[in-house]
Amino acid sequence: MFRPSILARELGEYDVVNVGAAGTFVVRKPRSRSEFRNALLRKLPFAAELVLFDGGDFLRLEAGNPFAPELSSPDVVRFVGILSKAVSVRVSLPVTFPPDGEWLVRVMESEGQFVFGMYRRHMKTIGYLGQIDKLFGVPATIRNWNTIAAIVRVLKTPPR
């Protein structure tokens, strides 16, 4: 069974911090991007598509607070979709899933490789989140805004 926390420890020379349970890592002692990518791929027990960002990208996300005007409620989760690569296609936003009736997923805006939205806690939501890949034409991974905030906290903490 794959355990991201164990993988983070195995990549100790890079001072990798595992954030959450889905394999989101903060690398606090980076070298070259290609060197880290190769080291990570060698340690993974399966094939994976990796998306690497500079920490400054997440610091700018937090500073810009894309959810500031939106009211929060316990049944609505704010998320960031991270696209596997920048896309040239412009998507007319906002988009809701399902398109009719009460929305379960609402994609509000996009900026570079980041997509911002909200979803309601419902059994059908996961299927609608999968539509983001189709909407933008590239694979996307979804992270709760709380995960982004946790990444920023790690980035703001001095390395060991």
Model-derived segments and their meaning:
Residues 1-160:
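Surface-exposed, charge/polar-rich loops and edge strands
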